[in-house]
A protein has these predicted regions:
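Low-complexity, intrinsically disordered Gly/Pro/Thr-rich segments
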Residues: 120-136
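N-terminal accessory segment detector
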Residues: 1-117, 133-140, 149-150
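Glycine-rich GHKL/ HATPase_c ATP-binding element in histidine kinases
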Residues: 143
């Protein structure tokens, strides 16, 4: 038997982010897969935690929600680009959001489309309670997100 010397890896910020991002996405996929394996849907999983974020957005409103979304999507995708904006509506794209899942079509019985639908539902429910519409669609440029005051 040989003795192995272990050492703590030295990671740069990009490597740390990639590991954290993969952990986050894999946990989302596992949770959706778990729900499906038990005869439930991604909606069941999303509704479980969505009630916790409603009070925050009721307090902070449209501008805060849009800023949060731009921040999140900028962190989680290769490129985020605003296509149009006004004081009541913004449309932006996020490219290469979880390209591994998009390329493989599914991981652990969960598709890219299901993850996008889950995210749309996750943000859409609290938005509806505070007078905001939220929609997502998959395009050739990535995911297009539309947020508007009702």
């Amino acid at each position: 038997m040989s003795q192995t010397d272990f050492s703590v890896p030295v990671l740069n910020d990009l490597q740390k982010f990639q590991v954290a991002n993969n952990l986050c996405m894999n946990n989302i996929i596992m949770a959706i897969s778990y729900e499906k394996a038990h005869g439930r849907t991604y909606e069941d999983y999303g509704k479980f935690g969505v009630e916790m974020i409603i009070p925050f957005y009721k307090e902070t409103g449209f501008e805060s929600f849009v800023k949060d979304q731009l921040y999140v999507w900028s962190a989680m995708s290769e490129k985020t680009e605003i296509l149009s904006q006004s004081e009541n509506k913004i449309i932006f794209t996020a490219s290469k959001f979880f390209p591994e899942l998009e390329a493989q079509e599914q991981i652990w019985n969960v598709t890219y489309s299901e993850v996008i639908k889950w995210l749309e539902m996750l943000y859409g429910i609290p938005c509806a309670t505070i007078g905001i519409s939220y929609s997502m669609k998959i395009t050739d440029q990535g995911v297009e997100i539309t947020i508007a005051r009702k």
